């Protein structure tokens, strides 16, 4: 590189650093060789973390911290994500999971160009079912929040979109999940508390999903 261009490059970088613009540069495109769903899981974790932070700030007079809420897992006894996604070297008895009645989702881009083991198929299928359950709950909850005269808080549409993107990546044939309708008059106070509970639980699950995708990317 000629001296003039080198000086120009250095000057540009110094200026960016001085103006603190370097931190706001676009995120690099994922490596083509990266496990396809890792990028989606990273986006999911970022989106739900941002939404949880927003909820805690907006609902500051509600019990919305991890110490104040009653922790609840809506996927309990319905999916086996934690067990199914254990690394093979930590799985002592795969036959226990084999005996489960499970329908596999194996036609998404997450499995593109990969040999699919039973455990990987079970793991990704379970993650898909988790996302589907949370998607239904969030859509139903958002419909109630939109009815609130105070219009205090709504779910971030980016988070809902990221959930849908990961579901599509796990299953090309994924259909739009209908939201549950309710004839009851919404209790907005309880709905907002429920939102905090759901966001805390979903962030924990998003951390698990991201770690699974990171492990699969490295394996």
Curated annotation (Swiss-Prot):
Disulfide bonds join 37-110, 64-196, 85-123. Residues 1-22 form the signal peptide. GO terms for biological process: cell migration; cellular response to virus; defense response to Gram-positive bacterium; extrinsic apoptotic signaling pathway; immune response; interleukin-12-mediated signaling pathway; negative regulation of blood vessel endothelial cell proliferation involved in sprouting angiogenesis; negative regulation of interleukin-17 production. Glycans are attached at residues 93, 107. Keywords: Cytokine, Disulfide bond, Glycoprotein, Growth factor, Host-virus interaction, Secreted, Signal. It comes from the Eukaryota. Induction: (Microbial infection) By pathogenic organisms, including Gram- positive and Gram-negative bacteria, parasites, viruses, and fungi. Down-regulated in response to enterovirus 71 (EV71) infection. GO terms for molecular function: cytokine activity; growth factor activity; interleukin-12 beta subunit binding; interleukin-12 receptor binding; interleukin-27 binding; protein heterodimerization activity. GO terms for cellular component: endoplasmic reticulum lumen; extracellular region; extracellular space; interleukin-12 complex; late endosome lumen. Pfam families: IL12 (PF03039). SUPFAM superfamilies: 4-helical cytokines (SSF47266). Its main location: secreted. It is found in: Secreted. InterPro entries: 4_helix_cytokine-like_core, IL-12, IL-12_alpha. The keyword Mitochondrion does not apply. Belongs to the IL-6 superfamily. Heterodimerizes with IL12B to form the IL-12 cytokine or with EBI3/IL27B to form the IL-35 cytokine. IL-12 is primarily produced by professional antigen-presenting cells (APCs) such as B-cells and dendritic cells (DCs) as well as macrophages and granulocytes and regulates T-cell and natural killer-cell responses, induces the production of interferon-gamma (IFN-gamma), favors the differentiation of T-helper 1 (Th1) cells and is an important link between innate resistance and adaptive immunity. This is Interleukin-12 subunit alpha. The lineage of its organism: Eukaryota, Metazoa, Chordata, Craniata, Vertebrata.
